[in-house]
Amino acid sequence: MGINAIVGQSGGPTCVINSSLAGVFSACRRHGVQKVFGMRHGVQGLLKDEVIDLTEALDAPGKLSLLRHTPASYLGSCRYKLPESGQMEAVYQAIFDALRRYDIGYFFYIGGNDSMDTILKLSDYAAKIGSDIRFVGVPKTIDNDLTHTDHTPGYGSAAKYIGTTIKELVRDSTIYDLKSVTVVEIMGRNAGWLTAAAALAEDEDCEGAAMICLPEVPFDPEHFIARVDALQQQTPSLVVAVSEGVRTAEERYVCELAHNPVNVDAFGHTYLGGTAHYLSGLIAARLHSKTRAVELSTLQRCAAHVASETDVSESFDVGAFAVDAAFEGKTGVMAALKRVSDEPYVCGFELHDIHDIANLEKTIPLDWIDAERYRLHEPFLAYARPLIAQEVKPEYQKGLPRHLKLNR
């Protein structure tokens, strides 16, 4: 069996994915691994032999602490889809040739649904050829849609940013004595966890989002307009949070109603965008109200300055837990978070077979959603509040947060 470890990051980044990388690296060193390699741009980089020695890059004092609070993917990312089993055998042979060349015994991949698909295919291929390399997935996605885990590292920080931004937009939207609607577009294709985080803004000091539109509930433009109109009779200035993935009962994305060209990625996912602009235009045309469209876009996944310290810590710990599992002989699994209690918030870790996770999605339970009023019920708030708890204290340099940059 190989003596070295290799780790990669894949898919969309988060502001805590590097904390998981730090956890993997730290635990590997604790287990006595001499060389910990990093794949530049995920498995796609491995195929191009773009591999770096993290032992040299991260062993200096202070590097891991800085890495934990650096947003985006330190190693770079990819959206490379491995071929199905039995197809393009040469791709798998090239990957395992590279792993043998670096004497790899432990393979860790930090990512979401598509990244777990990679762990599934590589661990299955390893079993097929009799390889003893251990493949373990480390969860990551702001979308919070991985199954068999209470929540996904990255979600808590994104939710904290969204809740914070909604509070600030509510304050901004009320400064003029006129009717206005600010439509805020938030990421989320099939699962509305991110958009639901707008509900966290409501408190004694903030009205919060007046409406929250989620992809779990079919979108009816007429019902939407009627609800906006009714609410404006009570409160002239509204903030509406809408998922980029909201779709009609006919399964048509609302952003497509604006006649935007539709493109797809390597995994067949439609590129979304323009939902807020379409809805703000619809409101302006039908209700003659001032409107503004705001797209949070990539800000919601890289705002490390307002990250949740709970999220940062859990991300590090789940990376370390994945390494511990590999050294216990586990392979073809994903490390997952298991909530023990809400108050006080206690969360531990467990393993799940990758076949039960890859290519599946977890959506918000429908009984947590008030579809008629475009609101979230208390169970969601009890679920999400602990995940945004505690504040980070990043290192600053010349008045701005300092990050760890990989020299190419």
Question: How would you describe each model-predicted region?
Answer:
Residues 256-408:
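C-terminal non-catalytic interaction/assembly regions of soluble proteins
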Residues 4-7, 67-81, 140-150, 178-180, ...:
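Gly-rich Lys/Arg/Thr-decorated short loops/hinges at beta-loop-alpha junctions or inter-strand turns
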Residues 49-105, 114, 153-155, 167:
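Glycine-rich oxoanion-binding loops at beta->alpha junctions
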Residues 10-12, 39-45, 79-80, 112-113, ...:
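Short, ordered loop/turn segments at secondary-structure junctions
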